[in-house]
Amino acid sequence: LSEEPHPMISIVGALAFGSVIAGRRYRSVNANWTAMHYVLAAPSGVGKNYIKSGINRLLHASGLEDFFGANFYTHASAVYWALNSAPTHICVTDEFGDSFAEARKSENGNKMTVFKAMKQVYSDVDDMFRADAYSMSGLSKKDREEKKMPAVVIPSLTLLGLTTPGQFYNEIKANHIEGGMMNRYVVFNLGRDNVKTKRKMGNGIPSESMVSKVREVRHLDSAPRDYAFDARPNFIEVEFTEEVVAIFSRFKDE
């Protein structure tokens, strides 16, 4: 889609897309799922938003349009209901750094609950995500039953935050690191270098081969698109090869 694509932007988009289409479908022998939280920090004008268009179009073409979630969430309860409706989905959010700034403002407590909820969802990926409880004092038994919020089993929320470096890094405080929020993000920092000029532009329509590969990875011809939010999904267990284990070991040593 972009006239001057950045190779790393394409890689980040592919990682995020792979995270969502494999969500609740694949699990490693070490209980790792594919839902990841990515942040792409790059200056304006390098084509960050093309990721959003590409993921959206490919999910729609593959019949997985409900896997593409809202631009962001207004409150922790919105995170819960989004997963209740689509237990596997991706949130590609623009101006992620601005959302960080809004959450820090005392007058925007709702936005802070969103980040707390997403942090909890990340931790609960191999378990259940439960919404905050509200007082039911004075309600009848029938009303209490209707207001129950069942846990989301194996919540798969992939996050891709798009931001400029200044927006994001200027808002990071010590409590974000100490509280474990930053540990959950895989952050990519890009500059204006390595931009490639394309002589031939694509039409933005996903090819049949791409759609076919998505359906193959998701096993759409032999399995449901997804399982109910309150049901434990049947998954494919993935072994780690010796080469991968060696890479993990080197990473830990560093």
Regions found by a protein language model. Give the residues of each.
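Phosphate-handling catalytic cores of nucleic-acid transaction enzymes
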Residues: 1-254
